[in-house]
Amino acid sequence: MTSQAMKIQTALAIALLTAASLVLAGCSGVDSTTTVTTPVTVSGMVLNGTVHGGQQPINGATMQLYAAGSTGYGSAYTYTSGTSLLGTHVVKTDINGGFNITGDYTCPTPTTEVYLVATGGYPGPTAPVNNNIALMAALGPCGLLSGSTNVNINEITTVASVWALSPFMTGIANIGTSSTNAQGLTNAFATVNELVNIGTGSVSGPALPVGATLSAATVAKINTLADLLAACINSSGGVAGDGSGCGLLFTAAKVSGVAPTDTITAALNMAQHPSANTSVATTVSGGAPFQPALTSAPSDFSLVITYTGGGISAPKGIATDSTGNVWVANSGGSSVTKLDALGVTTTDTTGYLSGTNGYNVGSLNAPVALAIDLSGNAWVANGNSTVTEIAANGLTGTLFNGGSMSSPSSVAIDASSNVWIANSGNGSITEITPGTTPAYNNYNGFGVAAPSAIAINPK
């Protein structure tokens, strides 16, 4: 990580940009179902689009519109008639890969996150049916879909959607979050539009903020992953180990010895195990449809978005608040930067410093760590053995310098809003009880020596 940029792996970024923490691993979530028999009446709009394998239209692919669940990670939203919002309606692509969904669905709620999936079909005018085909595009809140919504589903939209949603995903029809982390799922769907333009099926997305970039290496990874999917999709299919395009992909995407049988599941396995079998990248030919591609095997298939601006300078600490905003402690600029869930530097209604050089209130001094309390205030450990509390809006700051703090290295906040600081300089722990007259306690002994981190046991 350079002193002027913050790089966040997409899979990790989704966790960091959520109201929850790093436990958002789709492979370890609860696979359950949210069943609704009487959906909220939000009329479905016409959806138009095309499905392509590489540059080749897919004819006869079956379209499904799915909604994300809310009863656990990897949960599915289900009507009594099935998991798809289209119910018994059958929508297939035509010879040009085109599809038209003419309002044959009802949004569960206006804010329910939805996504389109295309499976099967003929990947060319004379090609046989390929049942290994599975492509997708994350659309976002159901209520925002309109008659002008046009979707170009291909391998690029599939890679972007799967990688962004992988912490919440266990299968094609299983994307969901817990009842306490709806914001996290919202942020993940929004991240898709930073990676890809769903309307054109190309990198990068319209939501990529000013100052944020996809590196050449990340673009090459996306293209390579898309090419691996295309080698399977633009074929008659196959199984792991048969040497075909599908066979190579499914072999590389095995998890615990079990090979996938469709391209979305293969992509999901690779997203959730990004360091496994990366040598498959070398099987992509120079004539593959998505270029530029990788020329050698990467160390992993993680996707990185680089965020700059807002005063980011030698960042040392990062934390998220309850609405998904990311707070960054800038040791190089003695400031704190606040980014929204898409990485956009925030500017308060008063035009405060966050959009330029970051917040610098409360005598910030080479901050090294920070934590957010239940009210959204940021508590920042400074390099000069003090702690600064920054109000949630960034407009005011309060300096705390008691409790024998010495080179604080980490901050944590308990359920009673007490602030705990690990002091690496004198081998102690400081507790601050905020208030009009703050109270300080210092604890040493118990084998504490130069502590570098601190956490609270919620029990």
Features from the language model and the residues they span:
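Bacterial N-terminal signal peptides that target proteins for export
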Residues: 2-14
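First exposed extracellular module after export/assembly in secreted or surface-exposed proteins
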Residues: 2-3, 85-87, 92, 329, ...
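Hydrophobic helical h-region of N-terminal Sec-dependent signal peptides
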Residues: 13-21
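C-terminal motif of bacterial Sec signal peptides marking the signal peptidase cleavage site
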Residues: 23-26
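Beta-strand-dominated extracellular/periplasmic modules and repeats
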Residues: 31-144
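Predominantly extracellular/luminal cell-surface or secreted proteins
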Residues: 64-70, 119, 232-235, 339, ...
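Mature extracellular/secreted ectodomains of secretory-pathway proteins
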Residues: 106-305
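Flexible "stalk/tail and boundary" regions
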Residues: 282-459
